[in-house]
A protein has these predicted regions:
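Generic structural signal for well-ordered, non-transmembrane alpha-helical segments
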Residues: 5, 9-12, 16-19, 39, ...
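Acidic/histidine-rich alpha-helical segments that form the ligand environment
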Residues: 71-123
Length: 123
């Protein structure tokens, strides 16, 4: 699996993990706002994954399955979490995503690099 495919795999797992965090946020006085942010972030991960997987298919790359993705990147357990823990996990995901976006640019056509940089900036 190349770095572009690893990015697609990471986006799939981040989507699922953000969904878990979204559903299991508890005991937060700012629950509504933080819950909405988590929803926005998992939507963004899903949309970026969809777009980049389709671009990868056009470049001749095979889509990583969720099973393959989970062999590389861990899924979170569906545990209730307070906002400080959720925020720490989320920021770690964002860091991992921005690093993987950087790696995915190697050997990728310029027109795709522009899209990767646009998406990377969003995180």
């Amino acid at each position: 699996m190349n770095e572009f495919q690893r990015l697609c795999a990471l986006l799939k797992v981040c989507y699922e993990n953000l969904l878990i965090l979204h559903h299991n946020l508890t005991g937060d006085p700012a629950w509504k706002g933080n819950h909405e942010w988590l929803g926005d972030w998992y939507d963004m991960a899903a949309n970026q994954a969809d777009d980049l997987i389709e671009i990868g298919l056009q470049m001749g790359y095979r889509e990583p399955t969720i099973a393959e993705s989970l062999m590389i990147f861990p899924a979170l357990p569906a545990d209730n979490r307070l906002w400080p823990e959720t925020q720490t996990i989320t920021m770690g995901m964002f860091t991992q995503l921005t690093e993987q976006f950087e790696k995915a640019q190697t050997g990728t056509p310029d027109c795709v690099i522009n899209k990767l940089q646009e998406y990377q900036y969003a995180w």
